[in-house]
Amino acid sequence: MSIKLVNIGFGNIVSANRIVAIVSPESAPIKRIVTEGRDRGMLIDATYGRRTRAVVITDSDHVILSAVQPETVKQRLHTDSSEDDEEIN
């Protein structure tokens, strides 16, 4: 099993195998998840002071804030996995 990485903006990279969800930060439940993650010490702010546009939730209960749109992260994740498939074939 190889480690797949995805860029979440500004040179920050997350293991794609650990990502559970990539969501928009506007809804109240997601804001609550971010607050709880901050309280537990499981929040990683990768926005470099910019506006949070995506919240990445991992299987280890880490909450990662990104300044990149969720759709952009999804495309990067999909592009990376497509390139891996092409290398195998």
UniProtKB/Swiss-Prot annotation:
Any coiled-coil regions, as ranges: none
Top-level division of the source organism's lineage: Bacteria
Pfam families in alphabetical order: RemA-like
Assigned protein family: Belongs to the RemA family.
NCBIfam families assigned to the protein according to its UniProt record, in alphabetical order: MtxBflmRegRemA, PRK04323.1
Protein name as it appears in the record: Putative regulatory protein Nther_1328
Species of the source: Natranaerobius thermophilus (strain ATCC BAA-1301 / DSM 18059 / JW/NM-WN-LF)
